[in-house]
Regions:
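Catalytic-site microenvironment of enzymes
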Residues: 33, 101-110
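Conserved anion-binding
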Residues: 1-41, 45-49, 57-61, 67-72
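Glycine-rich phosphate-binding active-site loops on the catalytic face of alpha/beta enzymes
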Residues: 65-103
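Conserved, mostly hydrophobic/aromatic
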Residues: 34, 52, 91, 106
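Short, structured coil segments at secondary-structure junctions
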Residues: 55-56, 84
Length: 110
């Protein structure tokens, strides 16, 4: 399993750490590398799933998925019902507060 770019990073953050690419450009590049390396799965932000799907034809895992609009520390997160991924990683949206109610809310949102 490979990782494209952390959901807590945006274009500005990439520049600060020395990348001269946009998030989308870096994700596309890393998707090509993952395909060449014959990885079984690739992790990417909800906003880059469509970019990755065009290049990488295997499983896509998507963190930064939220129930509702709260983003916590994620800069590139999205509501679960809008994500076209094979696997969704949903953390604090479920674990903070009443877990049973949050899971029911998640199921209803899908």
């Amino acid at each position: 399993v490979g990782v494209t770019t952390l959901t807590s990073l945006n274009d500005r953050d990439l520049k600060l750490i020395g990348y001269n690419r946009s998030v989308k450009n870096l994700v596309a590049h890393q998707s090509k590398l993952a395909r060449q390396a014959k990885l079984d799965a690739l992790v990417c932000s909800p906003f880059e799933v469509n970019i990755v799907r065009k290049i990488f034809k295997k499983e896509i895992i998507t963190p930064g998925v939220q129930i509702g609009k709260r983003n916590y520390d994620q800069k590139r997160s999205m509501e679960a019902k809008k994500v076209n991924s094979d696997w969704l990683v949903i953390g604090r949206s479920v674990t903070r507060g009443n877990i049973k109610k949050n899971i029911q809310k998640l199921i209803k949102s899908l």
